[in-house]
């Protein structure tokens, strides 16, 4: 693949240099604009499908990043993958230092593989759970309620 890419780059640079590189018009009637990224876009809605949550986590990393509310602040979610499991959206269905952190989504579940605690360094979820036990059945929310 690298060799193919290198050859294509050389070919493209040659056509650019000799002026034969073809131009392609933009179709203004079908183009769309995306809004500027904001921190609010990174707040996880656990009612979304697991695959959408995982894509959001990967797509918004490193900035603005994704997070969810936990006691003590916001937990940054850095890497994740779709997992098996079911429960109420946001419900912790696995919190085992040997297995990791799995949270139910609106459809499916999300295994958080790397995260960052408030004021901490990025770490894998297994290491996080060794120092910050989480009860299975805890429901993570977009924001912490102060009842």
What positions do the PLM features span?
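An anion-binding loop in the catalytic cleft
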Residues: 46-147
């Amino acid at each position: 693949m690298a060799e193919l890419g290198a050859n294509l780059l050389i070919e493209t640079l040659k056509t650019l240099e000799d002026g034969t590189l073809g131009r392609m018009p933009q179709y203004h009637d079908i183009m769309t604009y995306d809004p500027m990224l904001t921190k609010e876009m990174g707040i996880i809605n656990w009612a979304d499908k697991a695959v959408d949550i995982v894509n959001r986590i990967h797509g918004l990393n490193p900035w603005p990043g994704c997070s969810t509310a936990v006691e003590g602040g916001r937990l940054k979610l850095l890497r994740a993958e779709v997992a098996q499991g079911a429960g109420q959206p946001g419900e912790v269905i696995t919190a085992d230092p040997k297995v990791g952190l799995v949270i139910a989504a609106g459809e499916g579940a999300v295994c958080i593989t790397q995260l960052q605690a408030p004021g901490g360094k990025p770490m894998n979820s297994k290491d996080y759970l060794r120092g910050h036990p989480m009860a299975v059945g805890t429901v993570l929310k977009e924001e912490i309620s102060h009842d």
